[in-house]
């Protein structure tokens, strides 16, 4: 067995990046193909083999596995310090909950139903669901929901409810919607019409109106984004409802709110459109491992009780009814979410939101001060900027990229100091790209607006912002 170990290799002239050589985790802009990945697993000693019959060999292999695991922990610790492009909150300590990992907890079926199995965490799950019901203004006897495997499952569930209520409905989703929304349309064989977006990533309501008016005979199933994946744009629920009703869709529409990241943040912003079941929406989903932070992917989906009943089925084997997508569900996630919400409360979450938003504004200004095109939506902790020319920078800082753009999601664990180091490094490398190698600075006016573009054409007309 090749032991897992962390080593430092040069990624550029000024900085080092870690590589776990035995895992084949190289700093490269290229993705490994399926065959390459299989070869890496075999080559690096990660292929699963039967334990040796000889006691000494078995003991040696056991020690090797321990070293491999310890090395991988070291690798994850190091790489977590350079994680900027994806919405994960690493700022937590769940060590007091470690004893729960000695139990296999399965919250199969309806979390509110009695079951024969006693090894579960349903009471924690219901407590978490009640918290979110209060968060989104729905009375406890008027909602149903469950803890999901993440934002995608929440979208799949919410849009399935919409499809069941309106079997002949058309799904309307903006171009900036998460890919899981279009996956749901394909899975459920629902006609899907894409809606244009503004430069900020928000739904273009004029385009929504136009497309609704061309399909007035079919009910509308709307996916509203409370924070788009790449730009963090927030669709205005009130504007969507108004557009639907002006187009003659009264009582013939269903709105699902994809609130994966920003759904935990916008309620703490006074200027944000309020997402609430006091409005005629059908469901809301949010991720638990993003802003809240959780070791395992998870999420929450809430719908109206009357809507949930269209999916409910009694299952004799588990002595419960089930309206969920997956059936078996992670019973540890509810405990971790309950623990976080209990420790932080509204005041703690409010504080974290303000810190993240402040740091996001700082990053946007800092990028612009060194001449880098950048933009940050008012209600978002996501900063979009010019994609680095060197993919090693993308890899080192684990940036998410789309076309000419990259983005950083400023989470609670992303500090002021870390952002400063990143911008200093990027600015230094950028001089090499544009001065020494003669690259042209790309124009991003179409992507983020000319007021945020620092290309040669637009930079002369802009003022450098101050802190």
Swiss-Prot record:
Its EC number is 4.1.1.-. GO terms for molecular function: pyridoxal phosphate binding; serine decarboxylase activity. Its cofactor is pyridoxal 5'-phosphate. SUPFAM superfamilies: PLP-dependent transferases (SSF53383). Substrate binds at residue 178. PANTHER family: PTHR46101, SERINE DECARBOXYLASE 2. This is Serine decarboxylase 2. It comes from Oryza sativa subsp. japonica.
């Amino acid at each position: 067995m090749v032991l897992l170990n962390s080593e430092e290799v040069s990624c550029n002239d000024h900085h080092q990046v870690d590589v776990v050589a035995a895992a084949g985790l190289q700093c490269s802009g290229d993705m490994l193909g399926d065959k390459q990945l299989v070869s890496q697993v075999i080559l690096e000693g990660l292929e699963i083999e039967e334990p040796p019959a000889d006691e000494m060999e078995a003991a040696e292999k056991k020690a090797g596995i321990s070293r491999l695991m310890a090395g991988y922990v070291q690798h994850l610790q190091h790489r977590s310090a350079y994680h900027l492009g994806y919405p994960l909150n690493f700022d937590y300590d769940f060590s007091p909950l470690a004893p729960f990992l000695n139990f296999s907890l399965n919250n199969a079926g309806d979390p509110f139903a009695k079951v024969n199995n006693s090894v579960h965490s349903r009471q924690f799950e219901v407590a978490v669901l009640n918290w979110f019901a209060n968060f989104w203004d729905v009375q406890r006897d008027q909602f149903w929901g469950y803890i999901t495997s993440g934002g995608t499952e929440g979208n799949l569930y919410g849009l399935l409810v919409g499809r069941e209520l309106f079997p002949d409905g058309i799904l309307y989703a903006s171009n900036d919607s998460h890919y899981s929304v279009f996956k749901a349309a394909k899975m459920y064989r629902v006609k899907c019409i894409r809606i244009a977006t503004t430069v900020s990533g928000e739904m273009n309501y004029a385009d929504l109106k136009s497309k609704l008016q061309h399909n007035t005979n079919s009910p509308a199933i709307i996916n509203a984004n409370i924070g788009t994946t790449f730009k963090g744009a927030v669709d205005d629920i009130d504007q969507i409802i108004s557009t639907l009703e002006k187009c003659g869709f009264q009582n013939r529409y269903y709105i699902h709110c994809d609130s994966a990241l920003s759904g935990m943040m916008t309620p703490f912003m006074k200027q944000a459109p309020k997402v609430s079941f006091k409005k005629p929406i059908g469901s809301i989903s949010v991720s638990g491992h993003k802003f809240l932070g959780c070791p395992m992917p998870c999420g929450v989906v809430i719908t109206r009780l009357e809507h949930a009943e269209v999916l409910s089925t009694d299952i004799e084997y588990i002595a419960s009814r089930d309206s969920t997508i997956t059936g078996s569900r992670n019973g540890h996630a509810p405990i971790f979410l309950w623990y976080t919400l209990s420790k932080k409360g509204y005041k703690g979450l409010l504080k974290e939101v303000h810190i993240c938003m402040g740091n996001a504004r700082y990053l946007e200004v800092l990028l612009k001060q060194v001449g880098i095109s950048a933009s940050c939506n008012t209600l978002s902790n996501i900063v979009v900027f010019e994609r680095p020319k060197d993919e090693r920078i993308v890899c080192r800082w684990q940036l998410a990229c789309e076309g000419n753009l990259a983005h950083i999601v400023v989470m609670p664990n992303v500090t002021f100091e870390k952002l400063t180091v990143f911008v200093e490094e990027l600015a230094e490398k950028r001089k090499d790209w544009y001065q020494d190698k003669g690259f042209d600075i790309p124009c991003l006016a179409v992507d983020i607006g000319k007021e945020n573009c620092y290309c040669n054409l637009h930079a002369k007309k802009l003022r450098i912002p101050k802190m």
